[in-house]
């Protein structure tokens, strides 16, 4: 009898601290979030007619000032580029107002790759669900321009865009995953047909927790 009681006390002594430790801290969320395939498909369907579209489904509060954004991204073929934008005074004024980022140089290397992106505060995880292509990663940004856009639902916070120097290319196909820390270059060098991929973005103090994409928001 004593042994049974002692075992019970020992078990309680072990389990109670674990239960207390596992409780969410005050002010942190206490419920889980489900994002259905139907919701993701609904958002993706609105993107297919566009060359590039990146939309989060939700911005989920995960506690301690952190959020997790789940989105779906569509990119059309890079082999049929759109016409170059018309030059004019408006474009010149906009360029003058941007803040340089990365290394500035008058004569970038001939093998520099356009379309490099980095994010100041967000890690991104990509999971390819359709299509594929050749991505480029790592290296450093040359002649970049800093974006300060920070809408409630993203898809991203501030970052830098420009030329990539010293990057290397990787093939990404359905089922492949790419994880990009803040400040690390990523982009697409070649997309034969299209690529669609889920994005997972943890960030701290960047997005508005609770935001829901209007396409799937309850009316």
Residue ranges and their predicted role:
Residues 115-118, 124-127, 169-170, 177-178:
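His/acidic/aromatic-lined binding-pocket segments of jelly-roll/cupin-type domains
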Residues 18-116, 210-219:
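A short, N-terminal "cap"/entry segment at the start of jelly-roll beta-barrel domains
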